[in-house]
């Protein structure tokens, strides 16, 4: 954000007042504001469009049809090849006919809306910026001084090794969260097989190393914004995960950075969006060694809304996350050496958090520097 001469005091004051309400961004909207608080204003370079534009070129996210993928045969091989191409070129792809029932998806979106639109007194009980709290409600989590806040509220539910005490989940969305996570775990198993095969590994490889054994469910609520041109729903970033599966409603606003162009990802009812995380690209087990890419993306603030989305972030099991991993020997060679050093999952996350908005990906920090002969 832009910091004026007395900006230090103003930033701290506004942030403190906002946090103390424990009402989130929706609380500001409900109060009838016509201008957004200064700490939500993003610098021009953050809002700017890259040098290239999509005015003359229509780019469209790859869509992959999973129909019959579990029966094997030529259809599965075709899907694996499509995933390999999309993950290596785009880092994102849309999935249709994935097997998650539409009524469960709709119920989950409605439950998220119901949670965020309940009385503030109910949500306050979960308001926290403590990253160790497995179920919490907040807007941005801990921000570094002068970082710009994003125009959204989040309910987060973290399942370590697929487990979370049901009583910890808010009653207003408990049933829907449990049912949706079951579907996400089933999708994870399918995706783990297909991604393994796309990397040229045995289909059980990713499952065996437990690199996606935990889930963090981010239930996002993007309220209508009175000045959407000044802020963002979610700032530019890449995911500090292994894989993310996203469900979004009909509002839209998601953009991915492809070939230095912001590409809109319009909603498709019943579809899921898969995106490769930083850990898939290079960290944790250094699985893909840049065969797959984790790309930056953002969500625009909107003059309409609310926009509802649910992101399921897959991360390592507690056991796998506690160990450093080396590059997989099967995909390394003299021509294809390791690109990143070993590191722990927590080491990556800690570095990412310390950099705040100064970095959209922590991958360069762990890349091996090579001196050319």
Task: Specify the residue positions occupied by each region the protein language model found.
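Peripheral, non-catalytic segments flanking oxidoreductase cores
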Residues: 1-373
């Amino acid at each position: 954000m832009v910091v004026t001469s007395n900006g230090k005091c103003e930033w701290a004051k506004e942030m403190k007042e906002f946090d103390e309400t424990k009402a989130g961004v929706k609380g500001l909207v409900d109060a009838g504001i016509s201008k957004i608080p200064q700490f939500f204003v993003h610098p021009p370079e953050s809002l700017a469009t890259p040098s290239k534009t999509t005015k003359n070129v229509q780019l469209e996210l790859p869509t992959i049809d999973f129909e019959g993928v579990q029966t094997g045969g030529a259809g599965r091989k075709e899907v694996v090849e499509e995933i390999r191409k999309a993950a290596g070129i785009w880092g994102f792809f849309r999935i249709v006919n994935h097997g998650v029932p539409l009524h469960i998806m709709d119920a989950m979106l409605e439950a998220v809306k119901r949670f965020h639109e309940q009385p503030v007194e109910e949500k306050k009980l979960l308001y926290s910026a403590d990253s160790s709290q497995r179920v919490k409600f907040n807007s941005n989590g801990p921000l570094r001084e002068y970082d710009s806040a994003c125009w959204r509220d989040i309910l987060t539910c973290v399942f370590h090794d697929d487990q979370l005490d049901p009583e910890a989940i808010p009653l207003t969305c408990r049933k829907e969260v449990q049912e949706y996570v079951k579907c996400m775990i089933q999708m994870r198993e399918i995706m783990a097989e297909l991604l393994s095969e796309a990397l040229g590994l045995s289909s059980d490889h990713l499952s065996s190393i437990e690199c996606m054994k935990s889930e963090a469910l981010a239930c996002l609520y993007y309220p209508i914004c009175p000045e959407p041109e000044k802020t963002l729903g979610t700032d530019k970033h890449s995911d500090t995960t292994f894989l993310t599966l996203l469900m979004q409603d009909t509002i839209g606003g998601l953009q991915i950075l492809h070939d230095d162009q912001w590409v809109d990802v319009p909603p498709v009812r019943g579809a899921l969006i898969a995106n490769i995380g930083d850990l898939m690209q290079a960290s944790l087990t250094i699985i893909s060694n840049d065969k797959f890419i984790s790309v930056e993306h953002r969500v625009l603030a909107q003059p309409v809304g609310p926009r509802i989305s649910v992101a399921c972030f897959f991360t390592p099991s507690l056991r796998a996350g506690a160990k450093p991993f080396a590059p997989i020997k099967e995909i390394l060679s003299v021509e294809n050496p390791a690109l990143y050093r070993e590191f722990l999952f927590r080491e990556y996350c800690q570095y990412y958090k310390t950099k705040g908005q100064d970095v959209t990906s922590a991958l360069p920090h762990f890349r091996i520097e090579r001196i050319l002969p």
